Amino acid sequence: MSNYINQVSDSLKNHISELANNPCLFLRNPNVNFSRKRKIDFKTFIGIMMNSGGATMSKELLDFFDFDKNTPSVSAFTQQRSKVLPEAFEYLFKSFTDDNLPTTNNYHGYRLIACDGSNLTIATNQKDPETFWERNQHGSIVNKLHLNAFYDVLNRIYTDVLVQTAADYNEFRACATMIDRSKLENVILVADRGYENYNIFAHAIEKGWKFAIRVKDKNSNGIASGLNLPPNDEFDIDITQIFSRENTKTTKNAGYKWMPVNQVFDYLPRKSDKTYELSFRIIRFPIGSNSY
C-alpha cells in the first residue's frame, strides 16, 4: 500500500511540475503574469490550491507555509489566483487521472461509470448573474455552481467532471458532452431518473457504450408512459423507436415518433427531414412492496 501511495503521490508531483513548466498556456496574460519573483510563484500557487481544505484562506496559507512569520497575505494570494485560468486545473485533473486510472476492477469486462450532478454553494455575490441560483430557506441570496461527474464505481475514481454555472446548468447536456469526450471503452453507464433522456441514450449508443438508466414508471409522465408496454407488473422487452422532426400524416401512418423542435436531439437537427432509429431494452421489476 505504501508503494502505491508513493507512486500516486510522485505522479501528482510530476504532473504539477509539468504544468508549472508550461504556465503560459494557463495564464490570462502570459507575457506579464508570474514574470516577477514572488513567494507565491505558479507552482506554489498550484500547491496551495491542491492542499486547501475548508478553512479560511488565511489559515490555509499559514498551514501551507508552516506558520512562517513571512507567510504571504490573502491579498497576495488572491492577486496571483486572478492570473490563472480554470483550464490549469482541468488539465491537471485529466492528465493525472489518465495516468493513474486503474483497469483491474470491472463487471464482466465492463467499467461501471456512474453519472450524477450536485450543486456547490460558493461565496455570495449579488453582482454575478451567472452563478445566482435562488434564495435559500432563510431568505438569503445564494450563488452556486453545478458539478457534473463520471465516477468509476468499482475502481473508485472520478474519470471526468464538468462544472456549469447556474445560467447554463443542464445535466442532460453535461452527460452527453462527457460521453462524447471520453476515451473509455467497454463501459456501462449507470444513472438515476434525472438522466432519463433520449439524447443521452443515443449518445451512449453512438459511443458504443451500454447503459442502465432508471426511468419513471409507466404510469407517470416519463419515457415509459409513451411506450406500448405489456400490462404485466414485470416485463423485459426490446423497444425500437423511429424519430422524426416532421409531424405529418405520412410520418404518423409510418409509426414514427415525433420529436418536437424544442426537444434537443443531436442526431436530428431541428429542420431535418430524416429519421433516427433508436433501440433499447426496458425492464420493469419490483424494488419494494408496491413500487417498481
Range-by-range predicted roles:
Residues 133:
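Extracytosolic and intramembrane catalytic regions of membrane-associated proteins
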Residues 1-55, 63, 71-72, 76-84, ...:
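Single, function-defining residue in the core of a domain
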Residues 97-110:
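Intrinsically disordered, low-complexity basic tails/linkers immediately adjacent to helix-turn-helix/homeobox/MYB/SANT
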Residues 88-99:
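Short Lys/Arg-enriched helix C-cap and helix-to-coil transition segments
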